[in-house]
Amino acid sequence: MNGNLLEVINRLSSLRPIFNMEADFQFALAWEIQKKFPDWSVRFEKKPPNLKDRIFVDLWIEGDETCAIELKYKTRRFDIDVKGESFNLLNQGAQDLGRYDFLKDVERLENIVSAHDNVKGYAIILTNDSSYWKSTATETIDTKFRIHDGRVLNGELAWRPEASSGTVRGREKPIKLTGTYKLNWKDYSQVSGTSYGKFRYLFLEI
């Protein structure tokens, strides 16, 4: 599925170089997968079998193989008309929480994959916010959760001790990864020459 999914994303980038929101991205990707594989089952917000916890994945696909896909779409404020359609993206901010949530997706997918014999997992984040893919030498409370290009992720990832309880409320637990991931960001689209007109994505196979 890895190669097929990357092929679908590549095609989607020419058809839909920008999305209104995460649900728009989720539906568009599911639609392209269904078009390419019309006999496959594509389901939204599916609870995988064989799990005690109430865990749901963004996309659950059953065909020649079964896979679970988690998606994130993180944006900076950006207004543009593309192919006759107006897009008014919000400035989501809170990049530290965005990184944590993406890595929580990876941890969740690891648990799903380990509970099934023939399931693959894919975590995808698409963004026009370069702070996700660019590295920084500055130490921040979310240093361990950084997902910049070229980084290798594994093991236990936790907030720095000075992180306030208000900032990390609901996300206090460290993330524990059993796999090792070399982060390789890819270009998705360039809808304008402005700072936030470039979209890139990170694709991790679990």
Language-model region placement:
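N-terminal intrinsically disordered, cationic/polar leader segments
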Residues: 10, 42-43, 47-51, 67, ...
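Well-ordered, non-membrane alpha-helical segments in soluble/globular domains
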Residues: 96-108, 141-146
